[in-house]
Amino acid sequence: MQVAPGIHRLTQGVVCFYLIEDGGKLLLVDAGAPKDWDVLVGSVSALGRKLEDLDAVLLTHAHSDHTGFAERARTTAGAPVWIHQADAEAAKTGKGGKNDGKATAYLLRPEFYRTVFSLARRGALKIVPIHEVSTFADGDKLDVPGHPQVVHAPGHTDGSAALFLEDRSVLLTATPW
């Protein structure tokens, strides 16, 4: 679904990830769960593009429902993977980003269980390590399609980040809770 000019939301279960078109290149923001790969491939094809057009992958944080197929995109499409420096080690080791400390409260919400079962079916209960990552910090304007500016938003994880696309007046966030 196109949510703004050249910005496409790819949804699988409760997780959203985005493809940003910029000229002949694509930027992937977040990488869903490991089994969401086919969603990416189908979406790229529907845009009349090839995986080789994927220029970079930006991760908003190091949780398995956002890093899922990032390593596969890196090795298959040759797209470098970027993440905030505070979550880089978690992404590389597969240990997961530090939680926001509210996990117990989630247990009281019925949607928590639907989310966990959805993530389990899609292979997202464990982070797939990303062997090579580049890092960004608050305020960085990245030289990737869309030229997003990083807005560090710690809380959900220490390295949670939003991405501001100034020329499109769009702020992409990840898990809002």
Language model features: what each stretch is:
Residues I7-R9, V81, V133-T135:
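Conserved beta-strand scaffold positions in the cores of enzyme catalytic domains, especially
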Residues V14-V15, G42-A46, T67-F69, F136-D138, ...:
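A generic local structural motif
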Residues V29-G32, D55-A62, V81-H84, H152-G155, ...:
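Active-site neighborhood of phospho(di)ester-bond hydrolases with catalytic His/Asp-centered motifs
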Residues A33-K35, A88-W177:
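Metallo-beta-lactamase
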Residues G68-F69, A91, A162-L163:
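Active-site-flanking alpha-helical
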